[in-house]
């Protein structure tokens, strides 16, 4: 089906462009993560809420910068 292949190619191009923008903005999102975000937004998820969740998850998984001082 040429039409289905055209749609897949267009989707790949969109993700490639979004990945380039994401890289310029230092979002640290890979193509898979961007694709999932696009899918969630297309299905009605609020983009601001999604951004807040991603930021919260990054805070939770970020290594702590606290240093234990010897006593």
Swiss-Prot record:
Q: Which UniProt keywords apply?
A: Cytoplasm, Cytoskeleton
Chief location bin: cytoplasm
Give the GO terms filed under biological process for this record.
gamma-tubulin complex localization; microtubule nucleation by interphase microtubule organizing center; mitotic spindle assembly
User: Has keyword Cytoplasm?
Assistant: yes
Q: Which Pfam families match?
A: MOZART1
List localization entries: Cytoplasm, Cytoskeleton, Microtubule organizing center, Spindle pole body
Which GO terms of the cellular component aspect does the record hold?
Answer: cytoplasm; gamma-tubulin ring complex; interphase microtubule organizing center; mitotic spindle pole body; spindle
Q: Is Lipid metabolism given among the entry's keywords?
A: no
| Role played | Required for gamma-tubulin complex recruitment to the microtubule organizing center (MTOC).
Quaternary structure (record): Part of the gamma-tubulin complex.
Q: Tell me the protein family, please.
A: Belongs to the MOZART1 family.
Its recorded name reads: Mitotic-spindle organizing protein 1
- Which organism's genome codes for this protein? Aspergillus clavatus (strain ATCC 1007 / CBS 513.65 / DSM 816 / NCTC 3887 / NRRL 1 / QM 1276 / 107)
State the organism's lineage. Answer: Eukaryota, Fungi, Dikarya, Ascomycota, Pezizomycotina
């Amino acid at each position: 089906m040429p039409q289905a292949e055209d749609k897949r190619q267009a989707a790949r191009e969109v993700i490639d462009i979004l990945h380039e923008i994401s890289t310029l903005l230092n979002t640290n999102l890979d193509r898979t993560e961007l694709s999932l975000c696009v899918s969630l937004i297309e299905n009605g998820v609020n983009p601001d809420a999604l951004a807040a969740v991603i930021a919260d998850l990054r805070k939770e998984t970020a290594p702590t910068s606290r240093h234990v001082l010897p006593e």
